């Protein structure tokens, strides 16, 4: 049995936003509320990064069009006593997925701790 740090990626749609910063604030706030409601206050929330195709620098993973944004969010948590890295991902997806019912989740990284 091992302990793992699992990072998942989620996409969140934020409506009626003015700009990128507003979209990020709304997404983090709403996901935080959902996680806290599910007693998952131990899950870390961060904005995902993507690489700018022009300059190669990392930028926030946000697209705003017509006051609607899609925001890439990273959710990370520690999973204890998992049988394997794959088992740790399943545990994390199950725990977080219960709170974020209609938000798709994808595993990004699993590190043994």
From Swiss-Prot:
Protein name, entry field: UPF0212 protein MMP1509
InterPro entries per UniProt: UPF0212
Organism classification: Archaea, Methanobacteriati, Methanobacteriota, Methanomada group, Methanococci
Family: Belongs to the UPF0212 family.
């Amino acid at each position: 049995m091992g302990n793992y740090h699992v990072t998942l990626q989620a996409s969140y749609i934020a409506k009626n936003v003015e700009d990128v910063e507003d979209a990020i604030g709304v997404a983090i706030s709403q996901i935080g509320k959902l996680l806290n409601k599910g007693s998952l206050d131990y899950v870390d929330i961060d904005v995902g990064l993507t690489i700018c195709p022009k300059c190669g620098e990392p930028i926030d993973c946000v697209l705003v069009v017509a006051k609607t944004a899609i925001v890439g969010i990273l959710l990370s948590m520690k999973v204890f006593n998992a049988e394997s890295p794959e088992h740790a991902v399943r545990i994390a997806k199950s725990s977080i997925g219960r709170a974020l019912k209609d938000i798709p989740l994808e595993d990004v990284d699993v590190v043994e701790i």
